[in-house]
């Protein structure tokens, strides 16, 4: 498999988080959303579930999350909240929010 094929596959995965989540759920797996950076993914695997990284999306626009986020919040947090608000991540069975920064700390509320 060539590097171009692999890169195109990664681009497709990154551009379609909802499709990846749907594929996971269609396979009968439970999915737990994990926000960056230090969520204990090993615990999710140990519980027989799939950790699903919520890092935002290159295809999303920040709209609804602006109502909840201060202007200094990073794009990763704003896009993650956007995907949670617009239904992209509705199939998640739960979310782990590490509180490593001032932006993610209030996201757990």
Name the predicted role of every residue range:
Residues 1-109:
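An N-terminal assembly and electron-transfer interface module characteristic of large anaerobic redox
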């Amino acid at each position: 498999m060539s590097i171009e094929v692999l890169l195109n596959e990664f681009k497709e995965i990154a551009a379609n988080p909802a499709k990846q989540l749907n594929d996971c759920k269609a396979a009968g797996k439970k999915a737990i959303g994990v926000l960056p950076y230090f969520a204990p993914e090993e615990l999710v695997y140990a519980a027989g579930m799939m950790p699903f990284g919520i890092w935002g999306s290159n295809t999303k626009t920040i709209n609804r999350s602006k109502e909840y986020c201060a202007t200094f919040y990073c794009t990763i947090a704003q896009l993650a909240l956007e995907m949670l608000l617009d239904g992209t991540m509705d199939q998640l069975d739960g979310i782990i929010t590490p509180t490593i920064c001032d932006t993610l700390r209030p996201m757990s509320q």
